């Protein structure tokens, strides 16, 4: 992670060293993106900070037994697996995110900003202080967790806190459940039609940028 952070600092610039010219200035359209830890690394490298534990620092919950009492829409991993030994429990959570008024998702990715897609999350850290070079593009259901960021200057520097790359989102695989009373289901079946469409549009945007840069 130290290597990644140093590389991103030199690439994107940082409030931690304002005298250093970002390497990105030589090619402002170059794409840099990331998922989960990638978003966190980009934010820290550029001068932001992290919550080290979401349940404890954001929701004032100190143990798994109280973590699971938090509204499921606002959990970013599954703490039932720390309470009960059940091989069917998924270690992650599927929850909705909301888009901000930033133009990234609405005009760049071209999805409705009113959409609240279901996403795959597996993390306990999150952005606390946002690096000044970024805008927030998405938030958790209650608005407390930053779910997406985009660079204010470089159009192809963006990242999300969730995991759109997980192949089980796009086809039926193992049956899993979040809570003891849930009926086991595939991750793919947990996505509604609009959520699946969102994931495909997001990948479509990434593919478009890569194709343009390969010309």
What is each of the regions a protein language model found here?
Residues 4-30, 55, 60, 65-215:
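Amide-donor transfer/coupling interface in amidating biosynthetic enzymes
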Residues 52:
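Short polar/charged helix/loop
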Residues 22-49, 163:
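Catalytic nucleophile loop
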């Amino acid at each position: 992670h130290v290597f990644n952070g140093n590389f991103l600092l030199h690439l994107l610039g940082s409030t931690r060293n304002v005298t250093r010219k970002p390497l990105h200035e030589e090619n402002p359209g170059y794409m840099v993106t990331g998922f989960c830890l990638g978003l966190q690394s980009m934010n820290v490298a550029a001068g932001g900070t992290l919550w080290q534990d979401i349940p404890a620092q954001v929701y004032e919950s100190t143990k798994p037994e109280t973590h699971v009492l938090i509204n499921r829409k606002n959990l970013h991993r599954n703490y039932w697996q720390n309470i009960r030994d059940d091989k069917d429990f998924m270690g992650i959570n599927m929850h909705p995110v909301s888009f901000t008024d930033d133009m990234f998702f609405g005009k760049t990715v071209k999805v409705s900003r009113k959409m609240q897609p279901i996403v795959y999350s597996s993390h306990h850290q999150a952005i606390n202080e946002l690096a000044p070079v970024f805008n927030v593009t998405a938030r958790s259901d209650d608005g407390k967790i930053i779910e997406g960021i985009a660079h204010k200057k470089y159009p192809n520097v963006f990242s999300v806190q969730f995991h759109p790359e997980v192949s089980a989102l796009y086809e039926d695989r193992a049956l899993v459940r979040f809570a003891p009373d849930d009926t086991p289901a595939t991750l793919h079946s947990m996505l509604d039609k609009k959520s699946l469409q969102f994931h495909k549009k997001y990948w479509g945007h990434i593919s478009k940028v890569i194709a343009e840069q390969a010309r």
